[in-house]
Amino acid sequence: MQKVKIYEYESPCGKLWLAAKKGNLCLCDWAGSKNLTDTLSRLSKALDIEFILPETAPVEDKKKARPEKPAKVIVSAKKQLGQFFNGRRKTFNIPYQMAGTPFQEAVWKSLMDIPYGKSVSYADIAAKAGYPKAVRAAANACGDNALSVIIPCHRVIGSDDGLTGYGGGLGAKRYLLDLESPQQRLPFKTVTNKPARKPTAKKPAKKTTKKTVKKTPAKKPAAKKPGKKAPASDGIS
């Protein structure tokens, strides 16, 4: 297993980690990406390499006359990235190596066809890659891109112009899009995770006042007055 050193590049919108194997750039990813650990693990298995992280890299021996120099492709990548961020470069001329599934690599190759200063939707990329119904999978493949900026996944946005999902953060994505096409600043909107709405307390139901109908007691039938007794007969007819 070959040991590969990771080099750092400070861009105006975040730190990038760069690495190469046999003269080909295999890593250009954001140091703060939440997917970085998974990306390094995937590349290690696919390319049979062991990454030496910047934090664990051995300190150069000061007695050495010639300290270790980065590979030419790393030097070239840093130079071209500097030109890109200064607005003096629109495309990259760097040998690179992809490491993914056939579907992922089809998506990444489609990303390379997006012109500088343009943006497309995830549905467009899925269709371009030959999988028009796999929009969600295409979005995930963009997230697995290990060569950010070089392979411009930042040019893919939501169908509603929303800046959804990016390894370097939405701020970096907006920065890159504004850098490439300042006149398109207004249409883009940043989609943030809206806090869940607190359930509104149910208002107590209004008590319906029942009209009580007073029942008037039925009138007792009046007692019949005793009739007058006829006078007793005296026997005379």
Give the role of each language-model region.
Residues 133-175:
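Short glycine/serine-rich loop segments
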Residues 162-198:
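Phospho-regulated, low-complexity intrinsically disordered regions of nuclear gene-regulatory
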Residues 1-132, 183-237:
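Basic nucleic-acid-binding alpha-helical/helix-turn surface characteristic of O6-alkylguanine DNA
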Residues 118-127, 148-154, 178:
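A short, terminal or domain-edge coil/loop segment
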